[in-house]
Regions:
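N-terminal accessory beta-strand-rich subdomains and adjacent acidic, glycine-rich linkers
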Residues: 1-73
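Feature activates predominantly on carbohydrate-active enzymes
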Residues: 4, 11-15, 22-24, 29, ...
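Aromatic- and glycine-enriched glycan-recognition loops and surfaces
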Residues: 29, 93-183, 188-190, 211-215, ...
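Terminal accessory/anchoring regions of large secretory-pathway or extracellular enzymes
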Residues: 55-86, 96-97, 104-108, 114, ...
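N-terminal small/glycine-rich loop or linker at the start of catalytic domains
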Residues: 77-95, 185-202
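Hydrophobic faces of well-ordered beta-strands that scaffold small-molecule active sites
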Residues: 84-90, 117-121, 166-170, 229-231, ...
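Active-site neighborhood of glycoside hydrolase catalytic domains
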Residues: 143-151, 155-161, 182-284
Length: 284
């Protein structure tokens, strides 16, 4: 009849959509490899479902309806929600191979001349030069002094002195295959039937893992005085962790992982109310 509806499952983990021929719609948590045991009187809050509707006479699109709702009720009210900044990010041009202090600062000068408002340091600032950036996540305390001899705060101060904002990239959940963190702290790793995932990651359903992630983010923001942080996630968590020594159930590891991730983001937002947090997943 020309009327339109939009549904979105407000959830970062696995989900399930079923639309019948009769027009009935079922939306929710995937049933595959998911179980959640509740104790007597224990409650479980399920993820939200976003629904937008407009009739054929309306000129505004469904996306416009959704954007207005998110802007009014969901997105934090800070400088980024009012007007996005023009950003320079070193990725794709230099990636992790060619970026270093001299290259970054030279581009900051160009960005300043062009009126760009935000300069972001992407992957490649941690670990050692010989190992690929995707194999060292987790070693966030090990700043690559070969590439950045004066440290990250020096870069941030250089950017701030020119009236621009400083941003930095982080993939906090990822656990690089060759990282020192993975070698020294195996208790935090997400496992499936006792085996590591092809792309290892930290299970946030484990309290130690969650505390570590919060510390990674807050320490990096404080030490660099960052205005903007880009949180990436370049892996598939698949069905999550089913370890029985993590504090979550055997069938709800991924569910608890994302519940805790949202709690961490809320805590970071409370601590740094003006921090701009960008959600990124392999660039998307």
């Amino acid at each position: 009849d020309g009327n339109k509806a939009l549904l979105g499952y407000a959830w970062s983990g696995n989900w399930y959509f079923h639309i019948s021929k009769q027009g009935r719609i079922l939306v929710g948590q995937t049933k595959k490899m998911f179980t959640k045991m509740l104790e007597p009187k224990q409650e479980l809050k399920t993820p939200s479902v976003l629904i937008a509707f407009c009739n054929k006479e309306e000129k505004r699109s469904l996306v416009s309806h959704l954007h207005q709702f998110l802007k009014k009720y969901w997105i934090p009210n800070n400088s980024a929600s009012r007007e996005l900044m023009v950003e320079w990010n070193h990725w794709w041009t230099y990636e992790d191979v060619e970026i270093n202090e001299e290259v970054f600062l030279r581009n900051v000068d160009v960005a300043h001349e062009l009126g760009i408002e935000l300069c972001t340091l992407d992957a490649g600032w941690y670990g050692d030069t010989k190992t690929h950036w995707s194999k060292q996540q987790g070693d966030w305390k090990l700043v690559n002094k070969e590439k950045f001899p004066n440290g990250l705060r020096y870069l941030a101060d250089y950017v701030h002195d020119r009236g621009m904002k400083f941003g930095i990239w982080l993939e906090p959940e990822a656990l690089g295959f060759y990282s020192k963190l993975r070698k020294d702290n195996q208790v935090i790793e997400a496992l499936i039937d006792g085996n590591a995932y092809e792309s290892p990651y930290i299970c946030l359903g484990n309290p130690d893992g969650a505390r570590l992630i919060y510390q990674f983010i807050t320490d990096l923001v404080e030490k660099t005085n960052a205005d903007f942080i880009k949180l990436d996630f370049n892996l598939d968590p698949e069905y999550g962790c089913n370890r029985i020594d993590h504090g979550h159930g055997q069938g709800d590891g991924l569910f608890q992982h994302y519940r805790e991730y949202y709690r961490i983001l809320d805590a970071v937002r409370e601590r740094f109310p003006n921090l701009i947090i960008e959600n990124c997943a392999s660039g998307g």
